[in-house]
């Protein structure tokens, strides 16, 4: 056991986590050169296309160190995006140490900090690594100082390497083996194994990634899930070297995978503890704190026949992604679907794309909203996650919106632009610290503004140098209103949005103008209106298509023309009473982009 090392790799987006993992796998001979490819751990197509890591992946390797001993390294490659931070915290729970990878050109960024603090809170040994020293812009001395300044860990002798060229990766491994403590645990105690992650395989059922904390798990053992008390047979178990390799047992301190032929998706929840049925452990291991979704959106299948398969797909996906929340919802405009909760907009995009790809569904998404806290006039407090559920205005005593605490790190020269952006987003500055050339800014910004397009705008105003990390702070009373969209006098529930009173006329006008371009012209006028309660704040009209009834009149009496026009008018009026308007899919997406184009 003293030769086992469990560690994660944490870093900001694009600082080279996955490339470093590739090199480590190569040095330890986990894959032959023929099987090796770039970013071998990013196995999802989506991850390869976007060049980001979404799921944490684990690998077990054997490394022969310079002291002649052979060490077993279990390491987990983690995502860097703020939307997937729960993946990181789950991975860290299975480790004793973490490699903090920092780009020697870019320096410390917000995500580096956030993930590093998570690791320190969990009492992990953090080993700083300066990556990308082959770049002409690399300045390892300055970055080492920055790490000490901002993060507060000693980085004077931090390992320097270039994961791309492979320089110094050997030193990283040596340092790892030296600094990261071996796992603690009692191999003879009753089995306790933590479920770090699980996913659904069409042939095997539920596959779980587990970390054995105490005891030993052997093939054929009867295991019990502590939270539900159900027992299963351990049919197959083993490790990833990134390939799935079968083993006969997983010893104390090891990380591996387990198949118990669980067909029920809820059979082995993430964060649960497994133990042996005949000799159970006293108590479960502390799991993970549940993450609360920050953004909600409705997802509806385009054709209602897909509803069943959509429900199954969501179930399988939520097994793999513990932070996805969903409940059934129905809408008059879109039929039956689900209200889903996500950690952020990127998360929402990824989930939608995975559903469409992996399960072959066509989906419509409604505009994302955050959760509002509403105090009713009878002092009851309700939480509203969709504009259509907002109670009537006369029943609301106070409406509170969620405020996010945003930590930003950026170079000094972009400070002005970023502050302007934060103020425009109704932000309040709470802290500002200078670290050399970097500025650490803390703002409290309404969550609704953060999830809309704050991240994109922050990146564009700072030319990509600013980085952001945010978390939910509290609910705060605010003057929010619901803007309804009426089409020919009928409310369309899927198009409603909740916005701040000051922005309402502007958001309403913009939405109405956008919709006007998207709804195809009909044989009669279509009035598109935006309203707060019964007060109309904006209107535009999609003009009717009409035949020129006067084409056959040459000269002649004006009353003849009037008669024809009058007749046409009456026909259109009749048509308008019976006609209904088809809304194209783009109309629902229009809401997403309100307030984006250069405003």
Swiss-Prot record:
It is an enzyme of class 3 (hydrolase). It is a peripheral membrane protein. It catalyses: GTP + H2O = GDP + phosphate + H(+). Keywords: Cell inner membrane, Cell membrane, GTP-binding, Hydrolase, Membrane, Nucleotide-binding, Protein biosynthesis. It is found in: Cell inner membrane. GO terms for molecular function: GTP binding; GTPase activity; guanosine tetraphosphate binding; ribosome binding; translation elongation factor activity. GTP binds at residues 14-19, 131-134. It holds the Pfam family EFG_C. Its EC number is 3.6.5.n1. GO terms for cellular component: plasma membrane. InterPro entries: EF-4, EFG_III/V, EFG_V-like, EFTu-like_2, G_TR_CS, LepA_C_sf, LepA_CTD, LepA_IV. The keyword Transferase does not apply. One of its GO terms (biological process) is positive regulation of translation. Residues 2-184 form the tr-type G domain. Required for accurate and efficient protein synthesis under certain stress conditions. May act as a fidelity factor of the translation reaction, by catalyzing a one-codon backward translocation of tRNAs on improperly translocated ribosomes. Back-translocation proceeds from a post-translocation (POST) complex to a pre-translocation (PRE) complex, thus giving elongation factor G a second chance to translocate the tRNAs correctly. Binds to ribosomes in a GTP-dependent manner. Belongs to the TRAFAC class translation factor GTPase superfamily. Classic translation factor GTPase family. LepA subfamily. PANTHER family: TRANSLATION FACTOR GUF1 HOMOLOG, CHLOROPLASTIC, TRANSLATION FACTOR GUF1-RELATED. This is Elongation factor 4. The lineage of its organism: Bacteria, Pseudomonadati, Pseudomonadota, Gammaproteobacteria, Enterobacterales. The gene is lepA.
